[in-house]
Amino acid sequence: MTKPVCVVVGIGPQNGASFARRFASEGYAIALLSRKTEYSSNLAAEIDSAKVYACDVTVPSAIETAFAAVRADMGEIDVLVYNAGSGVWGNIEELSAHDFEQSWRINTMGAFLVSKEVIPSMKKKKTGSIIFIGATASLRGKPFTTAFAPAKASQRSLAQAMARQLWPSGIHVSLIIIDGGVKSLDSDANVEAPETLDPDDIATTAYFLSQQPRSAWSFEVDVRPSQESW
């Protein structure tokens, strides 16, 4: 039996790895897309159903090449998790136009371009799940988020527009707002810290969204630790 396919864009030792592990545990073939592939290769050695694809989400041709390879290797895509992000920090006096644009290219344009790669087949099947990973900055700007907050806010607006367009076609577009710090599963330094989110628990939320019944779809889910002040 052919496995359903989940593409995770943006792989690291926190959320990206947890998304991959969770969907793999549920029987999915996993495509790991990231600009640098060293960590992804180590993760793929751990997950039997995973394959690694180099992909710079700021380069349209790189996205087209990566997704063509995924389709050739695994088939059409059932779930897309867009976890790529750019932590460009600084105040407005410090940041360059390149810094500002690059943050938008990674957080928003990349999400736009990879979504275009999966929508046609999802429309044809009348089913599919696209999940964007947002942040506190998706909702409000703070000092030193001059580039990051506008990029995350525009990503959220993109997700809203896509959801309103695509839900009637059977494609569930959703957004997870991560409102807090995330611990690294590759380090024991903050394992017991109650004020950090466990990426495995965030991955549980992502999987839940991908399986929601159509009569009760969620668009935006914000997650934070119980100790977080909000």
Regions found by a protein language model. Give the residues of each.
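Conserved glycine-rich Rossmann-like NAD(P)H-binding loop of the short-chain dehydrogenase/reductase
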Residues: 27-41
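Active-site helix of classical SDR
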Residues: 115, 151-152
